[in-house]
Amino acid sequence: MVRDIGIDLGTANILVFLKDRGIILNEPSLVALDERNGDVIAVGERAYQMVGRTPKEINVHHPLKGGVIADIAVTEQLLELFMQKLNLNSWFSKPDILICTPTNITTVEQKAIIQAAIKCGGRNIYLEEEPKVAAVGVGLDIFSPIGNMVIDIG
């Protein structure tokens, strides 16, 4: 069964939305890595709990800065592990993924996001600007000739 997935790659948190179930994941955008070999020790909430409590060879990374990917390899690992955790990939059906992006990202950053989503198992990847997705999410008709204001405060 193919599922439609929405992902908000936030600097602080990652949210994953399924069309039929709503928000199914809301965890910190963090990855704990063993710097000696590059192994992922923990992601999300488990990585957050490790902040300031790890030996020097284990560091907690923030792979997203200002809403965009700062470290593509770590972001790919983060997305891949969350997809495995949620069991949203299968050999036979790859999900369509809509990813919210800031309005001011560059084409290089867009390509990095698409690359990360494809590597974690996405079939068709769509990027939409966060304000547009927020407006649709609260039920605004974005195609009507009536003006609306969407304010994103974090």
Predicted regions and their residues:
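Nucleotide/phosphate-binding catalytic cleft detector across ATP-hydrolyzing
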Residues: 1-153
